[in-house]
From Swiss-Prot:
This protein's name: Peptide deformylase
NCBIfam families documented for this protein: pept_deformyl (TIGR00079), PRK00150.1-3 (NF001159)
High-level lineage: Bacteria, Pseudomonadati, Pseudomonadota, Gammaproteobacteria, Enterobacterales
Annotated InterPro entries: Peptide_deformylase, Peptide_deformylase_sf
Keyword check for Protein biosynthesis: yes
Length: 173
């Protein structure tokens, strides 16, 4: 079990556009396992490699947080979006901040699995939201980027206030 260090907003590395994975290898699978370990340790439901300073197009998701439905997406591409759903979102890279973000209610995604096999799947509701959130990370986008400038300003103030209650290495600014 290896817990990776999470990058915290406003770390500029979160804005890095991830490179596609050229070939799925044992190293790729070690990254995936470490990402799941990190996500479970931090009590998240999704994690993009960018959030742990690995700039490859890899996403892990488990909505149940208990190793029950481990999903891996390598080089994901959302090919279809329908409907709109808005629920509060949060992020392991922006702890304790929750904001309502409009997302597509249903999506179709094409990807590689952890073995390098191509697949396509449909997702809706929470899974669709989580996939969209994590895919955004791969392109340097955060959930707060979907908010108004006024809300972002309020979040910055809240983060500064929260950062005083965290140790510097847990939530650096």
């Amino acid at each position: 079990m290896s817990i990776l260090e999470i990058l915290y907003y406003p770390d500029k590395r979160l804005r890095t556009i991830a490179d596609p994975v050229v070939a799925v290898s044992d190293d790729t699978n070690q990254i995936i396992n470490d990402m799941f370990d990190t996500m479970y340790f931090k009590k998240g439901i999704g994690l993009a490699a960018t959030q742990v300073n690995i700039h490859q197009q890899i996403i892990v998701i488990d909505l149940y947080k208990k190793n029950k439905q481990r999903l891996v997406f390598i080089n994901p591409s959302i090919t279809k979006k329908t409907g709109i759903i808005s629920i509060p979102e949060s992020c392991l890279s922006i702890p304790q901040i929750y904001e309502i973000v409009p997302r597509s209610e249903k999506i179709t995604i094409q990807s590689l699995d952890q073995y390098g096999n191509k697949f396509e799947m449909e997702a809706n509701n929470l899974l669709a939201i989580c996939i969209q959130h994590e895919v955004d990370h791969l392109f340097g986008k955060l959930f707060i980027d979907h908010l108004s400038p006024l809300k972002i300003k309020k979040i910055h103030k809240k983060i500064k206030k929260l950062s005083k209650t965290f140790k510097k290495n847990q939530f650096p600014l």
